[in-house]
Amino acid sequence: MKSALLLLSYGSPERIEDLDEYLKNIFNGKPVPESVREENLRKYEMFGGRSPSNRIIESIARKLHEKIGDDMDVILAYKHWNPSIEEAVKGLGSYDNIVAIPLFSFYSQNVKDSYLNPLESALRRYGFSPRLEFVNGLANSDLFLPMWANIISEDASEDSFYLFDAHSLPAPDREEDYLFWLRYSTYKISQILGLSRSDFGFQGGHLGWLGPSIYDVLNRIDASKITVIPISFLYDHLEILYDLDYEFRKAVEAKGMHYRRVRMPNDSAMMVNMIERAARSAITHLSGEKINGSIIGQPRIADTDNGR
């Protein structure tokens, strides 16, 4: 039986010259508003013309190959860059088992719509019918909370307010599980580390999306320091380096507060181990009885209701 681990992520251009093609992919071929193009051009120019995300994900893939390469091939695919999900699927015809893991912390319908649906559609178009497990969110792993607790504790400060940050999503009525995992993770990590002052907020949202925004939280707290924990993300990219470390930092410092952000898991040993464990667990599900249907990650509320 031949198996593959398909690592899925958003993707980013390798060169600033590729930005227009990248934005065209995001807008599904529709005209890109000039204001959006200029904003993204400014961001990429600030960071040398590229995001660090692709290199981090490639490093994760290499390290996973060293650990599980004898059992499954590790394949990369991006939602908005190359190789695309469609391109990756072209090479999956010889595989009996496929474990697909989008590199996100929390279960969400948005991830399902954006990654699982295109993956299944592409498999059907090519006439492939492997056994497929889709790991929707890595917060279900027993390594997730210890990983973040370890990162946060590296430079903990009793006089800091801890802001757990997540990417906002549309259609809040469809994202109860996403909100559950954010609340649960905030609660459990604060409990583990004894953080007396903490809350969560969202970034990148629009009217009617999940809230409150991190700016709303900032405006109602009184502290000399704020520590940001981008817990819905797993690796560095421009939404962290620009939106948080540049834009949000300015708002924090304008209130006379000190801004600090914890490091990201990136390609650390705990991160790689967490993905490896999720992949091996999914292969076990494929070879035996499935748990929670074909989508792993959805919370079993009876097991974790005390975190609501």
UniProtKB/Swiss-Prot annotation:
Gene Ontology CC annotations of this record: cytoplasm
Residues that coordinate or bind Fe cation = 167, 239
- Which example biological process does GO assign this protein? heme biosynthetic process
The UniProt entry, under Pfam families, shows:
Ferrochelatase
Which CDD domains does the record associate with it? Answer: Ferrochelatase_C, Ferrochelatase_N
The superkingdom listed in its UniProt entry is Archaea
Instruction: Write the Enzyme Commission number(s) for this entry.
Output: 4.98.1.1
Is this entry keyworded Cytoplasm?
A: yes
Q: Which residues lie in coiled coils?
A: none
**Record bears the keyword Iron:** yes
Q: What reaction(s) does this enzyme catalyze?
A: heme b + 2 H(+) = protoporphyrin IX + Fe(2+)
* Pathway the protein contributes to: Porphyrin-containing compound metabolism; protoheme biosynthesis; protoheme from protoporphyrin-IX: step 1/1
> What class does this enzyme belong to in the EC scheme?
lyase
The compartments listed are: Cytoplasm
Keywords from the named record: Cytoplasm, Heme biosynthesis, Iron, Lyase, Metal-binding, Porphyrin biosynthesis
One annotated GO molecular function is: ferrochelatase activity
Described purpose of this protein according to its UniProt entry: Catalyzes the ferrous insertion into protoporphyrin IX.
Give the family from UniProt: Belongs to the ferrochelatase family.
Which protein is depicted? Ferrochelatase
| Natural source organism | Thermoplasma acidophilum (strain ATCC 25905 / DSM 1728 / JCM 9062 / NBRC 15155 / AMRC-C165)
- Gene encoding this polypeptide? hemH
